[in-house]
């Protein structure tokens, strides 16, 4: 009996070291060698300073910027999660109605029937950095007007920031809001010169 306990303890310790230390360090090393940008969180830098991750959405409330999806967790990556409200839950409809009204208020001239679901509903993680191209195009008029840019210029920024389907098959075309807003910032700087 004592021999079995010793063997069990040794087995446990060996696997704790292998799976708790060796494996994570080896995988981290491989990730840093093969995918250094992604391994470090896909951090986007401007003038050498981090401004965000292309993997985590940010809250843009200023009308000068394209807004992203609503977040059930206020874009807090430490408490990722969606609302988990069922379609039959009155709170879901209250939240949806509030988001629709807010979007319509910020984007006059947009019809309720034109609003895509992604811009008024939070994602499952509450941290989605992407919106649909349609959601971006619906904001072009407001963003162009507030920034004093021609609508066509802002529309082209959206066009340039559309990411296609993964491997041409999976998912839907999407726009990373942070990248789009950084492109917009560059365009604003160009027009001020």
Swiss-Prot record:
InterPro entries: KdpC
Transmembrane portions of the chain: 11-31
Bilayer topology: Single-pass membrane protein
Domain of life assignment: Bacteria
Assigned keywords, A-Z: ATP-binding, Cell membrane, Ion transport, Membrane, Nucleotide-binding, Potassium, Potassium transport, Transmembrane, Transmembrane helix, Transport
Main localisation: membrane
Single GO MF annotation: ATP binding
GO cellular component, one term: plasma membrane
Family: Belongs to the KdpC family.
Subunit structure: The system is composed of three essential subunits: KdpA, KdpB and KdpC.
Protein name, entry field: Potassium-transporting ATPase KdpC subunit
Source organism (scientific name): Caldanaerobacter subterraneus subsp. tengcongensis (strain DSM 15242 / JCM 11007 / NBRC 100824 / MB4)
Gene name of this polypeptide: kdpC
